[in-house]
């Protein structure tokens, strides 16, 4: 009898345990997994946005939905698949097969539009869950993509460009907003960037070039206004393009600068008074350096140094460069920072500049025509700027400042410079010669009648390891300053291995430089006033009922709302107090006199 009771007790206990397990399983499937979705996203930080100098969003984070499936809770996989298919852009057969194949919870499709996620939830399908995720979006596609970079599907996992370099700042919450990272503001001007990419990309396609690179930099601050690299890619679909497209060739491409190097040799000659102003050098059309015969495009006859630059005379610059002692030339080239990284971005190439102990009697002669030395595009632009800005070697920079979600500046980047002792006389001589290059020399295809450009063409054969210089492989470039009388901008256009009959810097790169300058003159000339100008390419948001330059009514708005409304206009804002806006200067509908808007909150 006792044994019978014991067996009943054991059986009853077993049934109770089994019942509790079943109840627990139901509770888990019904509630716990849903809670897991919330916990998974509850502590996520929204990645900060990346803006150009106008406030145009180059990278932003938006809410998205990810659809998850609990196969054990789905009683009719076919019905569920048919219901989901139209929203997920997937064949129902494929969805059904995946559901039947899986046994544990899985993600069916990630980062779909949030509105689609809401519609799927309205279907009330058993076993279908929605997870909230953040999605990184690049609203203007490939605009500045090689510079900005991209993130993976998880937006906290940066993969390239500025997204990687400033990943920590973009993902670290600020004191004013614990849910969002800092915003990154660039020196890039989206309108100038667009014009550069449009002109450069068109010629890149037409010539079938291996690469095309364009840079525009403020000559007095080192701020990069535009930087383009082709082949390009859309960071929204980065998996559809190769690594060559993802690379920022403005800092990675290493090449021999060719005749653009002549301005640096001429700068040394002028700066050290190593030749007389009226001194001339004879060019019979070639010069022999040992067993090597270097040709000129023509037998130029007798030329002074300015004319040597004007006609890009190889023989003339080689003969003139022999006046420079090797140690002095070496010191100047190091001041120009050849063979060194500029400090612009971390993965920058250094180029190559031979140590003095490896120099031969011919080293300086080949260097005069841009051979035996290699540079990056950003390096050449920075070095050239120092010739035209009075000897200030600037560190190029593309980041202006960080801000919080209310627009308050958290950290501002300053101009870094090193004086290298270029005299005003030297600058005047070089700019005068380079202006003549464009007016009547090898760079005449960059000439604009109403606007002066100073420039230097570069055409060089490419060398391949073990084979030397190869016929048919060329590098074509144009280095320019504008306006020539008092330069504000230095720029470089470069084509690597162009195909077809035109491969010279004057024939290929100079016309592109001209097109870019013509298109951006209104932007450069009007300065800050153009921050209210936008292209159709950028018209994502509009201020309804607000004329360009007029201030909208912001009374009653929060700081975030005011910032969002004013962002497309690029108007600088100064916040006073906290809470909601009760006063603004200037008043709604009026224009700012000093370009700044003061908002008062309480």
Where are the model-predicted features located?
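Periplasmic/cell-envelope proteins involved in peptidoglycan metabolism and beta-lactam response
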Residues: 1-238, 249, 254, 325-337, ...
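Beta-lactam-recognizing serine transpeptidase/beta-lactamase-like catalytic domain environment
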Residues: 57-59, 214, 218-259, 264-495, ...
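Amphipathic alpha-helical surface "interface" segments used
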Residues: 101-106, 138-141, 351-356, 450-457, ...
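Short, solvent-exposed alpha-helical surface patches in non-cytosolic proteins
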Residues: 144-148, 223, 263-264, 381-382, ...
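Extracytoplasmic Gram-positive cell-surface binding/anchoring modules and repeats
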Residues: 254, 537-582, 587-602
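Short, gly/Ser/Thr-rich active-site loops of penicillin-recognizing serine hydrolases
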Residues: 409-415, 507-551
């Amino acid at each position: 009898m006792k044994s019978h009771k014991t067996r009943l007790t054991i059986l009853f206990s077993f049934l109770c345990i089994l019942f509790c397990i079943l109840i627990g399983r139901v509770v888990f499937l019904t509630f716990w997994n849903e809670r897991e979705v919330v916990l998974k996203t509850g502590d996520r930080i929204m990645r900060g946005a990346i803006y150009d100098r106008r406030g145009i969003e180059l990278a932003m984070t938006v809410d998205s939905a990810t659809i998850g499936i609990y196969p054990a809770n789905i009683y009719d996989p076919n019905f569920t698949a048919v219901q989901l298919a139209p929203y997920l852009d997937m064949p129902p057969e494929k969805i059904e097969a995946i559901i039947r194949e899986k046994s544990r919870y899985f993600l069916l499709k990630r980062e779909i539009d949030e509105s689609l996620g809401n519609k799927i939830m309205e279907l009330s399908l058993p076993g279908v869950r929605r997870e909230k995720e953040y999605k990184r979006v690049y609203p203007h596609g490939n605009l500045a993509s090689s510079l900005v970079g991209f993130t993976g599907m998880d937006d906290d996992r940066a993969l390239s460009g500025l997204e990687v370099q400033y990943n920590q700042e973009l993902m670290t919450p600020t004191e004013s907003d614990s849910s969002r990272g800092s915003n990154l503001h660039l020196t890039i001007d989206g309108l100038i960037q667009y014009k550069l990419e449009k002109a450069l990309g068109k010629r890149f396609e037409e010539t079938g070039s291996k690469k095309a690179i364009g840079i525009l930099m403020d000559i007095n601050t080192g701020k990069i206004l535009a930087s383009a690299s082709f082949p390009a890619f859309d960071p929204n679909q980065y998996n559809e393009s190769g690594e060559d497209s993802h690379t920022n060739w403005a800092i990675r491409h290493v090449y021999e600068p060719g005749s653009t190097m002549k301005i640096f040799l001429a700068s040394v000659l002028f700066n050290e008074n190593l030749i007389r102003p009226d001194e001339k050098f004879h060019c019979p059309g070639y010069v022999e350096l040992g067993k090597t015969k270097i040709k000129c495009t023509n037998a130029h006859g007798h030329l002074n140094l300015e004319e040597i630059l004007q006609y890009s005379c190889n023989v003339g610059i080689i003969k003139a460069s022999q006046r420079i002692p090797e140690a002095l030339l070496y010191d100047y080239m190091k001041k120009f920072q050849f063979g060194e990284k500029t400090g612009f971005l971390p993965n920058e190439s250094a180029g190559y500049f031979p140590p003095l102990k490896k120099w031969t009697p011919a080293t300086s002669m080949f260097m005069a025509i841009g051979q035996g030395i290699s540079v990056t595009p950003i390096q050449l632009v920075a070095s050239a700027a120092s010739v035209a800005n009075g000897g200030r070697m600037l560190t190029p920079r593309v980041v202006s400042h960080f801000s919080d979600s209310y627009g308050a500046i958290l950290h501002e980047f300053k101009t870094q410079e090193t004086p290298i002792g270029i005299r005003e006389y030297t600058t005047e001589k070089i700019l005068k010669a380079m202006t003549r290059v464009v007016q009547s020399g090898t760079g005449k295809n960059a000439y604009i009648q109403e606007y002066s450009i100073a420039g230097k063409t570069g055409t060089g054969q490419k060398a391949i390891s073990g084979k030397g210089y190869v016929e048919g492989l060329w590098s074509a470039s144009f280095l320019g300053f504008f306006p020539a009388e008092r330069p504000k901008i230095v720029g470089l256009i470069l084509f690597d291995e162009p195909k077809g009959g035109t491969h010279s810097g004057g024939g290929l790169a100079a016309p592109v430089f001209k097109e870019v300058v013509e298109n951006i003159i209104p932007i450069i000339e009007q300065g800050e006033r153009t921050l209210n100008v936008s292209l159709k390419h950028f018209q994502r948001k509009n201020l309804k009922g607000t004329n360009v330059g007029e201030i909208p009514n912001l009374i009653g708005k929060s700081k975030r709302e005011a910032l969002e409304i004013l962002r497309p206009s690029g108007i600088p804002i100064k916040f006073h107090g906290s809470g909601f806006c009760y006063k603004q200067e200037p008043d709604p509908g009026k224009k700012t006199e000093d370009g700044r808007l003061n908002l008062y909150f309480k």
